[in-house]
Amino acid sequence: SNIQTYAKKALLISIMALLFLDVEGNIMFIPEIRWLFHRNDLVIAHAHVAMGISVFFMVISMFINSIKELQKSIYLNSYLFALLGIFIVLSISGFTVAGLLNIPSQNLWILRTIFGCFTFIFISAFIQIGIKHLLLP
């Protein structure tokens, strides 16, 4: 296809989040492994986060060609790093709640907060760029 590199990255993040959402949804129907992942509301939030992210990056992939400021690897790579951090911490939290790992939940909350703040900073930067783009004549 004739899609630019940055749009491909944004679309890849969208597809990865959607696949994660699909896997999480399918786990709900397998009782033998459901207890590993879906033990508390924090872990169930995986799918809701993934759904929002997949739509967000699908939209970014459609408009990234016309917003040149977003065509920097640091935006997409930073957000992908933060997103993967959130998913990994939430997965580890699920294993801890299931009793498979012994990690203090306070440490997991700290990591989750750090990755969440990083994600929020990226979204704020994206909104600022979008506002500046809309205000241009």
Report residues per predicted region:
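Hydrophobic cores of alpha-helical transmembrane segments in multi-pass integral membrane proteins
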Residues: 9-28, 45-68, 72-99, 108-134
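Long, hydrophobic alpha-helical transmembrane bundles and adjoining juxtamembrane helices/loops
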Residues: 1-7
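Non-cytosolic membrane-interface motifs at loop->transmembrane helix junctions
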Residues: 37-44, 104-109
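Interhelical loop segments of eukaryotic multi-pass membrane proteins
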Residues: 29-37, 99-103, 135-137
